[in-house]
Amino acid sequence: MSDSALMEKFEQEVWSKVPHREEKDGIAQIVNATPLIDLTDDLKECAKTVYDVDISDKDFKIYGKFDNTLPTGSIKVRPAANIIHDAITTGKISSGTTVIEATSGNFGIALGLLSKIGVTAIALVSRKLQEGVFKELRNGNIRIMDLDMDICPAPGMEDKQDMLVAKATAANVRSQMIELGFDPETFDNNISDIETLLAKKDIINLAKFLAKIYDLFCPEQYDNDLNVDAHRTVTGVEIDQQLHENGESLENYNIVCTFGTGGTSGGLSKYFDEQYSKKGVHVIFPPDQQDVAGIRTVGNADGLKYYNPELYAGKHQIDFEQAKPLLKFMVEKGHDMGESSALELYAALQMIYKNGGNYVVMICDGIDKYRKNFEKIGNTITPTQVSQQDVATNANDYDKVIWVHTQYTPREEGIELLAKSLGIDKSKIIIPNARTAQQLLSGQQVPEEIDQALQESKGKSLMVCMAGRTSLMAANVLAEKGIQTDSLTGGITGLPESKTKDLSQIIEQASQF
């Protein structure tokens, strides 16, 4: 049964401010449309001044659909509002309901609108979000559950690694659930299923499972057809409506978008098919291993319900490093757009250079969340990976060696082995606890102990872990904050001296404190 009082609040605080269909004088139209801005001249200038490419003789037109102007600043408010409206209508959400969802940021931020109607939202985040995203989640009164527990593999433990990570992460989730006021007994009674989901890194179904056992509402954005319908019935119609006002039609355009859940590409593809019997959506992906604003790579998209490449007009892989100068140009021109928009515009530029054409690029969010990374464009610090021989040869250059790992720590014999192998005095080796390491890897701030060690250093600082992966991650986190460090390739287990030792002689389970 619908909660009429809650629906009234929702319509007043949310629905009235987002794009939706309304009938006026018997004619259905979209209200609260976001701006559709002609970017043609600016893209011509960008191509010439930034990439030394002349597209002035190409027959093309390009618009930006600026959804960064929506409440909470992103396109994700469209499906979020559609799903919540339906959930209140059908009685799945009522006063006192808690909403939980897996998100890479923007959908969770959109759920922050629920605080305006007295509904609590919890966001499960499973990737290292940029500081600006965490800030907006917190400012939106979202309860954040951070599932990041990156663990560097330990030799001899590879087969057990996924379960080790799952158990460590489950303990982390349990403590956060308690902090949020949930009964730990319910969690403990379902621990096997939870660890299985975590071992598979299946955060999407973890959100669904927690909703089930705690009687919460999960929007299920990755599997909810209302996500796709929001773009099929509103976004597509809205763009077409605006083009018609300019004497044009979406029939003569293609849309360029990136892939998060597949809702935008899926809904707009359906609109093109139903209205114009054509494939009209070009979907853009970053390369594998490149993390761009929560946008999925092809590998991460494959297998999701709404990843349907057979519906697309084109599928493109764009290196964000190539698109960064374009992002800088457009933002400095006064266009508020985020990282995903740069990928789309760069892809559109490539297509226009080859064949011309007309495009609408989805500007899914603005630059504010990514401001810190944006300011580093053209001034990037890159960590150096160094071998044991490199360090030993230049031992006098290194003033601090910092161990970083969330599961293991060197014993006294391991510390002595590090000092001897690297030719560095043992007093220069810093061993923070596991909690401090996790705080550093979360990317939010540099823990006091590590910050102090770095500030005291009069030379280079070297990050060391078990096998080299976690230390490189830590060095990258520090680089993002403008701090230069090196990372030891292969870690402690890659040192020649360690190969003659039993691992348990030099390494032990890390303490949290």
Locate each region found by the language model.
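PLP-dependent amino-acid enzyme catalytic core
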Residues: 1-399, 407-413, 432-441, 452, ...
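C-terminal interaction modules of eukaryotic adaptor/scaffold proteins
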Residues: 480-481
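Short, basic/hydrophobic alpha-helical segments
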Residues: 447-456
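Active-site neighborhoods of enzymes that stabilize oxyanions during catalysis
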Residues: 499-513
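Extended, charged low-complexity segments
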Residues: 488-490, 497-500
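Short, surface-exposed ligand- or partner-binding patches at beta-edge/loop junctions that are enriched
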Residues: 463-464
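Substrate-recognition/cap helix-loop segment adjacent to the acidic, metal-dependent catalytic center
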Residues: 414-426
